[in-house]
């Protein structure tokens, strides 16, 4: 990918949610909501603080994260739909 986010921004690929409920009910495409889980495919160098120093991000490429449903800006790169958002919009890192 030829996309490098600046400062405290990250590029995220949405991860598909489960197609079935725990009870075995298949969820149709029309009833699905946008996934709020994704994998970081690129990350900026860090947040620039008021004193000019750079604070490294807490997330890195390859991390799986949770974010708000309407967070970020949707973009399309080489036919792939991605999200660009600030690190502050990420709610949690999913530990493996």
Swiss-Prot record:
Gene Ontology annotations for the cellular component aspect, listed alphabetically: cytoplasm
Predominant localisation class: cytoplasm
An annotated GO BP: chaperone cofactor-dependent protein refolding
Gene3D superfamilies according to UniProt: GroES chaperonin
GO MF entries: ATP binding; metal ion binding; protein folding chaperone; protein-folding chaperone binding; unfolded protein binding
Keywords carried by this UniProt record: Chaperone, Cytoplasm
Disulphide connectivity of cysteines: none
InterPro entries associated with the record: Chaperonin_GroES, Chaperonin_GroES_sf, Chaprnonin_Cpn10_CS, GroES-like_sf
Record's subcellular location: Cytoplasm
SMART domains for this protein: Cpn10 (SM00883)
Family affiliation: Belongs to the GroES chaperonin family.
Role played: Together with the chaperonin GroEL, plays an essential role in assisting protein folding. The GroEL-GroES system forms a nano-cage that allows encapsulation of the non-native substrate proteins and provides a physical environment optimized to promote and accelerate protein folding. GroES binds to the apical surface of the GroEL ring, thereby capping the opening of the GroEL channel.
Subunit architecture: Heptamer of 7 subunits arranged in a ring. Interacts with the chaperonin GroEL.
Listed name of the protein: Co-chaperonin GroES
